[in-house]
From Swiss-Prot:
Domain of life of the source: Bacteria
Swiss-Prot/TrEMBL keywords: DNA damage, DNA repair, DNA replication, Ligase, Magnesium, Manganese, Metal-binding, NAD, Zinc
Gene name as annotated: ligA
Primary role: DNA ligase that catalyzes the formation of phosphodiester linkages between 5'-phosphoryl and 3'-hydroxyl groups in double-stranded DNA using NAD as a coenzyme and as the energy source for the reaction. It is essential for DNA replication and repair of damaged DNA.
Protein name as it appears in the record: DNA ligase
Naturally occurring in which organism (per UniProt): Salmonella enteritidis PT4 (strain P125109)
GO biological process: DNA repair; DNA replication
Residues that bind Zn(2+): 408, 411, 426, 432
Reactions performed catalytically: NAD(+) + (deoxyribonucleotide)n-3'-hydroxyl + 5'-phospho-(deoxyribonucleotide)m = (deoxyribonucleotide)n+m + AMP + beta-nicotinamide D-nucleotide
Length: 671
């Protein structure tokens, strides 16, 4: 080995050691200035001999070139989410379900951790070297963020120690400490940059930078909490044991991990963490509770999207008091007019809240709310701000009543409130710019026509400039016309045109959902498409015929019938088809020719399945001639009840409908 190679090896080993002491052990031995000096020395030597630079060198955390787009990484082991509980009663019920499933009266040993409010990531090590990293994504596929994760100093590029598996995928949370968050926003305000609403958004935005050099400047950190792939090695047989092993290999683990030997001990841990929450220095939104024994975890297994052996115990939504300065009225896709309270800005659960929905006139009346009132604001689920109540004892002398508009605030059309409905609606239809915008945004959304790259701001400009009036107009757009929009260059414009062309090939169900018929969500659209098969059959269906579709009652049937009875709607559909929107011809299943116990039956799935996903079960049932519905009614022939089946099972029993379990379903599917 050359002297310079020896020097490089020693420097890298020294720097990794001090990174471990700083980020994992929280016990630095040297000042930052000395660390910086060692890093500079390493950089200078590598500059002399670039052929000796290794991928796991501490200098390689910031060297990747900017990405043009994120590639996708498929998770070999799905990244499942956790079920939630929100109060002690729900947790105790969860504890009992676990004990019942284990057929044990002895207390379970629980491993309790903090529920970090950051971004879940998967990091793959091969022979101890970091080779890839990905976001959770949809649980099956995530975004490749390897270059950015390599810039996070808390994450070792190379594990140290003995008995490291050949392939080890660790999972954890990337997050931003509050001090770092405040510094980022302080710098942004000074330079006119983006100010983030909360540390989680800042962490997500930092991790998804196309230029890793920007990520490297953000003080992100990481805690490890689990494992995915494990090949060519072994891990301890308890969750806590695994976390301690990860820490020994150089991976950071929270110091607030605790074993609890009873439900009461778990509740004590929860209360202590909630009390300490303001002083932790980073955001959490609850605690995570896991069965410590891996053998018991395997015995308990999984439901469709979550393990049975773990749960997230969320903290209550945080509340603050503030004043209502005004109330404005927004118009939605279906003409619904929603009152929105404009508030004196206030921090609630780490977010600056300045608006809150008031839902409708009935809610305003229920609250007894007036403009100028002092109110209690809650972020329900830590996401959607809402007004909880009015502080009547502190009502100011000068308050004003909230007057609901008699005409649309956008287009001036009359408003109406149908008897029996809480919602007031604009009658303007597509002549209303607000409805047009929201309808088009729905039309191009991912679960509808899925037009990649056509965001809300583009739709807003297209409507405001009178370029687009109906969904069909979207497919007539040219790159030249789009290039005239704000922040839209020729390449971006052509990408949108290409995406529109690609979106023309869709499915009947997606097309129906995209049309935005009132009360027709994805499931109902799929049911209508499966039942009628063709657009022609659906357009000519009567209200009685529509009600034969599972889950379609008189209200939905009337909305669908009225939509297709409207000449302007039929005209838009004709234009869409003329522009080339199409979908595959229906596969007609003749139930008389299908030899299956499910043929011609209306079937409802309820509860959690353990042997296959709900979507797989629906697809297999439909292939055997079943009509899969979402709710139980007198038209239901069969209910398949998985774990934790609830009200649907009770209703089926009340109506005397045949009920089978998952095992029987699987037997019949193979019959």
């Amino acid at each position: 080995m050359e002297p310079i190679e020896q020097q490089l090896t020693e420097l890298r080993t020294t720097l990794r050691h001090h990174e471990y002491l700083y980020h994992v052990m929280d016990a630095p031995e040297i000042p930052d200035a000395e660390y910086d000096r060692l890093m500079r020395e390493l950089r200078e030597l590598e500059a002399q001999r670039p052929d000796l630079i290794t991928p796991d060198s501490p200098t390689q955390r910031v060297g990747a070139a900017p990405l043009t787009a994120f590639n996708q990484i498929r998770h070999e082991v799905p990244m499942l989410s956790l079920d939630n509980v929100f109060d002690e009663e729900s947790f105790l019920a969860f504890n009992k379900r676990v004990q019942d499933r284990l057929k044990s009266t002895e207390n379970v040993i629980w491993c309790c951790e903090l529920k970090l409010d950051g971004l879940a990531v998967s990091i793959l090590y091969e022979n101890g070297v970091l080779v890839s990293a990905a976001t959770r994504g949809d649980g099956t596929t995530g975004e490749d963020i390897t270059s950015n994760v390599r810039t996070i100093r808390a994450i070792p590029l190379k594990l140290h120690g003995d008995n490291i598996p050949a392939r080890l995928e660790v999972r954890g949370e990337v997050f931003l400490p509050q001090a770092g968050f405040e510094k980022i926003n302080e710098d942004a305000r000074r330079t006119g940059g983006k100010v983030f609403a909360n540390p989680r958004n800042a962490a997500a935005g930092s991790l998804r930078q196309l230029d890793p050099r920007i990520t490297a400047k953000r003080p992100l950190t990481f805690f490890c909490y689990g494992v995915g792939i494990l090949e060519g090695g072994e891990l301890p047989d308890t969750h806590l044991g695994r976390l301690l092993q990860f820490k020994a290999w150089g991976l950071p683990v929270s110091d607030r991990v605790t074993l609890c030997d009873s439900p009461q001990a778990v509740l004590d841990f929860y209360r202590n963490v909630e009390k300490d929450r303001p002083t932790l220095g980073f955001d959490i939104d609850g605690v995570v509770i896991k069965v410590n024994s891996l053998a018991l975890q395997e015995q308990l297994g999984f439901v469709a999207r979550a393990p049975r052996w773990a749960v997230a115990f969320k903290f209550p939504a945080q509340e603050q008091m503030t004043f209502v300065r005004d109330v404005e009225f927004q118009v939605g896709r279906t003409g619904a007019i929603t009152p929105v309270a404009r508030l004196e800005p206030v921090q609630v659960a780490g977010v600056l809240v300045s608006n809150a929905t008031l839902h409708n006139a009935d809610e305003i009346e229920r609250l007894g709310l007036r403009i100028g009132d002092k109110v209690v604001i809650r972020r329900a689920g830590d996401v959607i701000p809402q007004v909880v109540n009015v502080v009547l004892s502190e009502r100011p002398e000068e308050t004003r009543p909230i007057v609901f508009p008699t005409h649309c605030p956008v287009c001036g059309s009359d408003v109406e409130r149908v008897e029996g409905e809480a919602v007031t609606r604009c009658t303007g239809g597509l002549i209303c710019g607000a409805q047009r915008k929201e309808s088009l945004k729905h039309f191009v959304s991912r679960r509808a026509m899925d037009v990649d790259g056509m965001g809300d701001k583009i739709i807003d400009q297209l409507v405001e400039r009178e370029y687009v009036h109906t969904p069909a107009d979207l497919f007539r757009l040219t790159a030249g016309k789009l290039t005239g929009l704000d922040r839209m260059g020729p390449k971006s414009a052509q990408n949108v045109v290409n995406a529109l062309e690609k979106a023309k090939a869709t499915t009947f169900a997606r097309f129906l959902y995209a049309l935005g018929i009132r009360e027709v969500g994805e499931a109902t659209a799929a049911g209508l498409a499966a039942y009628f098969g063709t657009l022609e059959a659906l357009q000519t269906a009567t209200i009685d015929e529509l009600q034969k579709v599972p889950d379609v009652g008189i209200v939905v049937a009337t909305h669908v019938f009225n939509f297709f009875a409207e000449e302007s709607n039929r005209d838009v559909i004709g234009q869409l088809l003329a522009e080339g929107v199409h979908w595959p011809a229906p596969v007609v299943i003749n139930v008389q020719e299908v030899d299956s116990p499910f043929a011609g039956k209306t079937v409802v799935l309820t509860g959690s399945l353990s042997q296959m996903s709900r979507d797989d079960a629906k697809a297999r049932l439909a292939a055997l001639g079943a009509k899969v519905a979402g709710s139980v009614s007198k038209k239901t022939d069969l209910v398949i009840a998985g774990e934790a089946a609830g009200s649907k099972l009770a209703k089926a029993q009340e109506l005397g409908i045949t009920v089978i379990d998952e095992a029987e379903m699987i037997r019949l599917l193979g019959a």
